Amino acid sequence: MFARLVPRLQPQLLSKRVLTARYPMLTTTPIYHQTPMQIIKRNYVIVHRERKKEPVIRYLFYMLVASWVAIYFVANRVDKKKPPQQSFTEREFQSYEEETGLKRRNKLISHTMNSKYKFYVIPYVHDEEELKKVANLLQHKDENATVKIIDPAQLIEEQKKDEGMKYHYLLEDLDEQGRPYPPGLITAVIKQEIYKILNTREGTFDTNFIIKNYPQTTNEAIKFENDISDIQKCLILHYDMLNELPKNKTNEEQRAIKNVDGYFNSVGKSKTLVEKFDPMDKEFEEIMLEDI
């Protein structure tokens, strides 16, 4: 019987020997036959347990919703605490013009029309009698042209009173909010008035325009020459600038108006009229000779 079992057990015994020879770790060695390193390896085997997979997508979704809610409430609080805007930038004014169809196009009066329409600006004038005297002297020196005085302050008031005017609602909003007029707004109102004049019978004549109390910033001066026409002369009334300007304007406004004089003086377009010491009539004689 034992002889019969030997052939059957021989392959199993042989395979066991081969495995033992190839992989000695598979055999069980008594502890008293093991080396210290084998004992340490046996006691410090790391067993990797399967971790439960957390719902990552659901977690991220909740975090995203929570962040949106937090941003919403923070933004609302910031808007409520944000102080009212105290200025109206040129970019905001341009956006307003684009939205309302009032965007500026090319220069209103081309260079070929400069001999027909001339513009004289007075950055600051306090005495209306002096303004009339300037207009009369200009009319006397250039009898072939009419003289038209433009008062930007009066044009602004007309815009406020008439709801049909282009800038009525903008001016109304700015006044209600106590915000200053944006750079370019006064120039835009003046441009509208000049455009209206040019499209009437009055616009068919050669005209010398006098714009009072304008420009009072170099920004407005540049915009006028970019959007409307070249400025012939900037007339500085010496007495009003010296005596009346400090009484009626803040230091910042005075500085801005004086900068206008400096700007036109740098390009040779500024003329100071000193009536008491140098007759104004003589000054206009020089202006007319320069224009010819």
From Swiss-Prot:
Coiled-coil spans in chain: none
Protein family per UniProt: Belongs to the AIM36 family.
The protein, known as: Altered inheritance of mitochondria protein 36, mitochondrial
Record GO cellular component, one term: mitochondrial membrane
Cell compartment(s), UniProt: Mitochondrion membrane
Superkingdom: Eukaryota
Lineage: Eukaryota, Fungi, Dikarya, Ascomycota, Saccharomycotina
Gene3D superfamilies per the UniProt record, alphabetical: P-loop containing nucleotide triphosphate hydrolases
UniProt key word Chaperone: no
UniProt transit peptide range: 1-26
Listed transmembrane segments: 56-75
Membrane topology classification: Single-pass membrane protein
The entry's keywords: Membrane, Mitochondrion, Transit peptide, Transmembrane, Transmembrane helix
